[in-house]
Structures are given as C-alpha cells and as structure tokens.
From Swiss-Prot:
Belongs to the coronaviruses ns4/ns4.8 protein family. The lineage of its organism: Viruses, Riboviria, Orthornavirae, Pisuviricota, Pisoniviricetes. InterPro entries: Corona_NS4. This is Non-structural protein of 4.8 kDa. It comes from the Viruses. Pfam families: Corona_NS4 (PF03905).
Length: 45
C-alpha cells in the first residue's frame, strides 16, 4: 500500500486493530470460517 509509507508509527498501530476487527467482522458476515485465519481468538473477546 502506498499509504503505508506516509503513515506514522503511532497512527499505524491505531489503524491495525481496526483493520483486524474489520477483517474478522466481514469474514464472519460473509460466512468465512475464521478458525482457519487465526482470528478466532480476537473475535471471542
């Protein structure tokens, strides 16, 4: 991603958790088995 080079460390750490949660949410909503992605532990908390 070209944007990655312009994002500072502090902002990047704030964006990543959102990206993970979004990926889990979208994965569950469209029926992807999250147990194969390794995100299952995140979705349970």
């Amino acid at each position: 991603m070209p944007m990655a080079t312009t994002i500072e460390g502090a902002d990047y750490t704030n964006i990543m958790p959102i990206t993970v949660l979004t990926t889990v949410y979208l994965g569950v909503s469209i029926g992807i088995d999250t147990s194969t992605t390794g995100f299952t532990c995140f979705s349970r908390y």
